[in-house]
Amino acid sequence: MAFAPMGPEASFFDVLDRHRESLLAALRRGGREPPTGGSRLASSSEVLASIENIIQDIITSLARNEAPAFTIDNRSSWENIKFEDSVGLQMVSHCTTRKIKSDSPKSAQKFSLILKILSMIYKLVQSNTYATKRDIYYTDSQLFGNQTVVDNIINDISCMLKVSRRSLHILSTSKGLIAGNLRYIEEDGTKVNCTCGATAVAVPSNIQGIRNLVTDAKFVLIVEKDATFQRLLDDNFCNKLSPCIMITGKGVPDLNTRLLVKKLWDTFHVPVFTLVDADPHGIEIMCIYKYGSMSMSFEAHHLTVPAIRWLGLLPSDLKRLNVPKDSLIPLTKRDQMKLDSILRRPYVTCQPFWRKEMEIMADSKMKAEIQALTFLSSDYLSRVYLPNKLKFGGWI
């Protein structure tokens, strides 16, 4: 079904263009400060030297008949996090730490696992080869136990060495998808065209390696869920609202999806919007894209896009559109705890409109998925809701 008449193309994108001008003006007024701490893209020689220094410390401890230990920044405490509107959540420079002792029953196994993965990283960097987190796990799956153990240790090492995961020569398999008005060349020379069709393109596993990015997109739309993303593809949304770019992280975004969103913003400075469910989980996912997460706060400068705006689904939209009660879902106790947690986070104080939307949700004790809009029509999301939001500036 075609869109309702909206006047000439230029007038449709008028509000979007003004929004972009305001974003560019904000960048000119101050913009984002260059990284002063946290991780960075380090040279191979720097990474090798850092690992050698750690091993030297272990040898020195053993020579003194002392039990060696790793000192790891505590990535799970809000006390170690500071908030800056231009960066998001980032780790403070002098944060609290924890000791991973080799002679403690509670941490001896983790000490040995860190040492093993450090050894693997050293060999990867030295030989200029790469491995995925999954590859590392399967070198000894029984020893590691599960993939999460490997993931956490790699993040701890990245934080300990103050370098990015890419500098460790460790890649992660991407689960995200991208479609729309975007072309680029991958590190191996492969030319990729994301022109929207029936299928999308997988987010590359090496975002730093892609080059020659080209787009005419007026905006980037981050879609929380794969099902919604696929529905918009089926509805030919990218072509109907061309030029644009759509991305999904299929729920909580992986590192590569976040890196890609950041790269698109840094390269093109076009408005970036999120489309998430009107529930605490969707709001948290949006916050991860915009302000980052506590566990990855040491990489904030490489991952966050504070210019992101919340396009939908807003809790206030539910009443405005008369979404029937049988399409709404009661908040669970877990939902309420999550919502309370988000409301207490430092970035909410600078987002009064977000706070208002979350308070509407808390007061109603109801949530809704994007699919709730299908009560109006099966293609209401792509035909009416999103075009009107984008044309008339319905974001916060």
From Swiss-Prot:
Pinpoint the Topo IIA-type catalytic domain residues. 42-177
- Single GO cellular component term: chromosome, telomeric region
Residues that bind Mg(2+), according to the entry? 224, 277
> Which Gene Ontology molecular-function terms are recorded?
ATP binding; DNA binding; DNA topoisomerase type II (double strand cut, ATP-hydrolyzing) activity; metal ion binding
How would you classify this enzyme at the top EC level?
isomerase
Subunit relationships: Heterotetramer of SPO11 and 2 TOP6BL chains. Interacts with TOP6BL.
What is the name of the protein in this document? Meiotic recombination protein SPO11
